[in-house]
From Swiss-Prot:
Pfam families: CbiA, GATase_3
GO biological process, one term: cobalamin biosynthetic process
InterPro entries membership: Class_I_gatase-like, CobQ/CobB/MinD/ParA_Nub-bd_dom, CobQ_GATase1, CobQ_N, CobQ_synth, GATase_3, P-loop_NTPase
Keyword Amino-acid biosynthesis among UniProt keywords: no
Active-site positions on this chain: 334, 438
Gene: cobQ
Stored HAMAP family: CobQ
Protein name as catalogued: Cobyric acid synthase
UniProt pathway annotation: Cofactor biosynthesis; adenosylcobalamin biosynthesis
Length: 500
């Protein structure tokens, strides 16, 4: 079999979605397939079953491929924590903090680790679906770019180039990319996928023929815009999200606000709320009156003290305090939980210069950032309720409750081992809560419990589709791709779908 590398003409052309779809398509055909991305830049990460950290996109792709996520699938993860720097997670563990100049000044170390992981995956699996990063034709960076064509060459992969027709200029995207890359890399490109087409596909049939004539590369498919599936975004709040709206939430919706920190992380925690038809979620960067909202969420942050200082400078503290006095519900997730406490100390300079900051003092807790990162898949029960939360913890902070403080969760399991512990905190009046659990809102019963705190008349959606979203995605792509050509590129014949 021949590995497949999904490379893009630019950032955000849909490489992650395409790779996810192909993982499920090949898995349905009975192939032992796994995802791989040499380097991710993202503050959206998760924890593998064996307790290592990797990007959320590759975790989702592993689920599509029906294999357990492994740190080798995303060996280099860059988690931006300043405007010019990032924490480097190497093969699932924190390695160092590097400025962009330091990191890109010598990529050999990172490339060696990435290829070591790639080699292991090629032994373990029949086929890899490799995702590139950004544009595969950034010529000023080409020699030190180990994520795109260098990875494809190492894996002996056939390259499929993805272009986004929705942003316009698709001919320039494809023809331009193929024109500027070296001939030896151009020879690896075996197909093109035109992504995010809107309207009548038949109107672009002439365009397909023109592209094939101009490049000599077959167009494997034109993929209509698909709204039935969302993969966790890597490095920015999705464009479909509502940010700093002028209007208040609709009167018939439950208004939820989330502060959009400069270094926001794991905002995918909010996706289940955003998808609920009864909820209107707004990301707020600029301070405004919160009178139209029932809840305020402080999400995760990759630079907690920096974002706390930003929050103070912007004037958010006054609005948050007024919201609490009005009876609003406030939830802090990971970094947001730390901000709600009395203080945050960073004695080792984990997230910047060593020092300490006063928190918002809405929860009776104090946090110290340690050198060692906690990485856990965890299960806990919301104290005083029958509801269990399954989530994951990724944090450098160790948070201590003051005497008499009440935890939010009774933790029963971490990384598959039974435990008797606690997590998070809640204020005496119950208005303010915080937790380290990412994925807190994932379970429908927990979401229902939370939303009924905001609106006693809330009813969870009825009659919603229970179809596997990966199957919906695979079906959508299968109907719009030339599977015979795709499978031939991978060295396979088209097989019947695997029964689920």
């Amino acid at each position: 079999m021949t590995n497949i590398a999904i490379l893009g003409t630019a950032s955000d052309v849909g490489k992650s979605i395409v790779a996810t779809a192909l993982c499920r398509i090949f898995s349905n055909a009975g192939v032992d397939v796994a995802p791989y991305k040499a380097q991710n830049m993202s503050n959206n990460s998760g924890v593998t079953p064996d307790g290592f950290e990797m990007g959320r996109a590759q975790i989702v792709q592993a689920q599509a491929a029906r294999v357990a996520p492994h740190a080798d699938m995303n060996p280099v993860l860059l988690k931006p924590n300043t405007d010019t720097g990032a924490q480097v997670v190497l093969q699932g563990k924190v390695c160092a903090d590097k400025s962009a100049r330091e990191y890109f000044g010598d990529t050999q170390r990172w490339a060696e680790a990435a290829f070591e992981s790639l080699d292991r995956l090629m032994v373990r699996h029949e086929l890899l679906v490799i995702e590139g990063a950004g544009s595969c034709a950034e010529m000023n960076l080409y020699q030190r770019d180990f994520v795109n064509f260098k990875t494809a060459r190492r894996a002996g992969a056939a390259v499929i180039l993805v272009a986004d027709i929705d942003r316009g200029g698709v001919f320039a995207q494809v023809v331009g990319t193929l024109a500027v890359i070296p001939p030896e890399d151009r020879a690896l490109v075996k197909g093109v996928i035109i992504n995010r087409f809107r309207g009548d596909k038949s109107l672009f049939e002439g365009g397909v023929k023109m592209l094939e004539s101009m490049t000599g590369v077959p167009v494997l498919g034109v993929i209509p815009y698909f709204r039935g599936f969302t993969i966790d975004a890597e490095d920015a709040v999705p464009l479909s999200s509502v940010v700093d709206p002028k209007q208040e939430p609709s009167g018939d919706k439950i208004g939820v606000a989330a502060i959009y920190f400069p270094h926001i992380s794991n905002f995918t925690d909010l996706a289940p709320l955003e998808r609920d038809p009864s909820v209107e979620l707004h990301y707020l960067h600029r301070p405004k009156s919160l009178d139209g909202y029932k809840a305020l969420i402080l999400p995760g942050s990759k630079n907690v003290r920096g974002d706390l200082a930003w929050l103070e400078t912007m004037g958010w503290r006054d609005e948050i305090e007024k919201f609490r006095k009005r009876g609003g519900i406030i939830v802090g997730l990971c970094g947001g939980y730390q901000m709600l406490g009395a203080s945050i100390a960073d004695p080792y300079g984990v997230e910047g210069a060593p020092g300490a900051s006063a928190g918002l003092a809405m929860l009776p807790v104090e946090t110290v950032l340690e050198r060692e990162k906690a990485l856990c898949n965890s299960v806990g029960k919301i104290a005083g309720t029958p509801f269990f939360v399954s989530g994951y913890e990724i944090h450098m902070g160790r948070t201590a409750l003051e005497p008499g403080a009440s935890p939010l969760l009774e933790v029963t399991e971490r990384n598959g081992v039974a435990t008797d512990d606690f997590d998070g905190a809640k204020s005496a009046d119950g208005q303010v809560t915080g937790t380290y659990f990412h994925g807190f809102f994932d379970r429908p019963e927990v979401r229902t419990w939370f939303l009924r705190l905001l609106d006693g008349g809330y009813e969870s959606p009825r009659g919603a589709s229970v179809a596997d979203p990966f199957e919906l995605l695979a079906k959508h792509f299968s109907e719009n791709l030339d599977l015979e050509k795709l499978f031939a590129i991978a060295g396979l014949s088209v097989k019947g779908e695997k029964e689920s």
